[in-house]
Amino acid sequence: MAAKDVKFGNDARVKMLRGVNVLADAVKVTLGPKGRNVVLDKSFGAPTITKDGVSVAREIELEDKFENMGAQMVKEVASKANDAAGDGTTTATVLAQAIITEGLKAVAAGMNPMDLKRGIDKAVIAAVEELKALSVPCSDSKAIAQVGTISANSDETVGKMIAEAMDKVGKEGVITVEEGTGLQDELDVVEGMQFDRGYLSPYFINKPETGAVELESPFILLADKKISNIREMLPVLEAVAKAGKPLVIVAEDVEGEALATLVVNTMRGIVKVAAVKAPGFGDRRKAMLQDIATLTGGTVISEEIGLELEKATLEDLGQAKRVVINKDTTTIIDGTGEEAAIQGRVAQIRQQVEEATSDYDREKLQERVAKLAGGVAVIKVGAATEVEMKEKKARVEDALAATRAAVEEGVVAGGGVALVRVAAKLASLTAQNEDQNVGIKVALRAMEAPLRQIVSNAGEEPSVVANTVKAGEGNYGYNAATEEYGNMIDFGILDPTKVTRSALQYAASVAGLMITTECMVTDLPKSDAPDLGAAGGMGGMGGMGGMM
């Protein structure tokens, strides 16, 4: 086992604070409308330019191991804030640095670290309740666009595009961000349910100009099995032909004789048919087939529940207004399923989202909710160069996360004003003893830090602006972009409550642990092994020769 280097008390805390400051100082230059960019060197390819706090934090590793421990703990604050709300990483880092700096001063002055932590925790719990009281719902497109604009560093086009996407696919719809091919940003919206499976034979195509199969008011047969024998399907095909409607078959696979017969029937015009593979694999395929059944009002023909294809009737088939199938995707538009059944299915999947343990499972379940409840929108980010593309895509993703958080928990006045108002309201808060009261004051003083940093990045004097804002009330604050005072809500400067709340909670959590640190242990650097060069060995041999 490697030997360890151990530091105690003030020595440990000074080293830790130095690491905290290196990381936080690099991250906080990005805060606010006049925040600057940070350039990150990459081992290959062009450097990355970013204004995303967590991207900067992730790149920082320090040579001194004690300082690095401090930096890594603050990095955890940024990562946690990013995971919880998708934004607010820079605010969280600024808050953490402020609490740690003030807290360690109090420890150095002889305060009890555990009581300080209890005071900080008490202040944060009270502050979270105050934030919830200040929060107003964010439901209209204008407010959503404003939140997106602020989070995308005052880029109005991004805010408007996100608001438009939410309008089209609903609050529950999936909105994804991709790299575009042109210079302009584009918004693609897919209404209805789309899954990544295309036609099984190009002979089904009835729109040669688009290379797609388009069927109006089709029946939809859902089968959780491979279909290779056409005899199994004859009763359904005959019933559909009599009804004079097209048929879409979604099955595990359609192959051999069955596929050939369907192609021949389609080409002769006896019955319009198209076959696609069911989406997903294993249990996920069963679940997605059930989703399609709920959406279209059909039944999944599965031998597991005692249903056979030969005995299927028109009542077992789903229906939709339109189905479009191309080489890679199938889109079902306006399924005829009952609204109550669809909502029930959505609620069931949401419950699974709550219980999911892996991010991958959670993402797939949320996609299923979106496909049932709304639709899918894709924002394609346009830029002139690869470097600009990456920077812009990161901003759009942040803005999207912020707008989702705003819809979820509402918004408060932005620009650091909400935390200043909360701190003012809690000025009379007290705890069990004087050391805990100092902890409360540490947390309340730290709540001014985001406002001060925004002002500092804008090139103004933080103390002057902070005192002017504190003298006002309600949503009165400082617009760093235009350098004027006024109502932040009227300026359209809004922060999602969830983002501000998460930033404060995670910052206080890690800062409290760091203030109560008394000892730090790390591996000693390995010294290079002594060089047993050839010359030494030869010298020995020479000596032996002399003895002879």
From Swiss-Prot:
The record's InterPro entries line, in alphabetical order, gives: Chaperonin_Cpn60_CS, Cpn60/GroEL, Cpn60/GroEL/TCP-1, GroEL-like_apical_dom_sf, GROEL-like_equatorial_sf, TCP-1-like_intermed_sf
- Cysteines joined through disulfide linkages: none
Assigned EC number = 5.6.1.7
| Gene3D superfamilies hit by this protein | GroEL, GroEL-like equatorial domain, TCP-1-like chaperonin intermediate domain
Task: Share an example GO biological-process annotation for this protein.
Answer: protein refolding
Residues the entry annotates as binding ATP: 30-33, 51, 87-91, 415, 479-481, 495
Cytoplasm among keywords: yes
What highest taxon heads this organism's lineage? Bacteria
An example of a Pfam family matching this protein is Cpn60_TCP1
Task: Give me the reactions it catalyses.
Answer: ATP + H2O + a folded polypeptide = ADP + phosphate + an unfolded polypeptide
Localization, UniProt: Cytoplasm
**Cellular component terms, GO, for this chain's entry?**
cytoplasm
Which key words are in the record? ATP-binding, Chaperone, Cytoplasm, Isomerase, Nucleotide-binding
Question: A single Gene Ontology molecular function, please?
Answer: ATP binding
Known function: Together with its co-chaperonin GroES, plays an essential role in assisting protein folding. The GroEL-GroES system forms a nano-cage that allows encapsulation of the non-native substrate proteins and provides a physical environment optimized to promote and accelerate protein folding.
The entry assigns this protein to a family as follows: Belongs to the chaperonin (HSP60) family.
Q: Which NCBIfam families match?
A: GroEL, PRK00013.1, PRK12849.1, PRK12850.1, PRK12851.1
Query: How does the annotation summarize its subunit structure?
Result: Forms a cylinder of 14 subunits composed of two heptameric rings stacked back-to-back. Interacts with the co-chaperonin GroES.
Protein's UniProt name: Chaperonin GroEL
Q: What is the lineage of its organism?
A: Bacteria, Pseudomonadati, Pseudomonadota, Gammaproteobacteria, Enterobacterales
Q: Which gene encodes it?
A: groEL
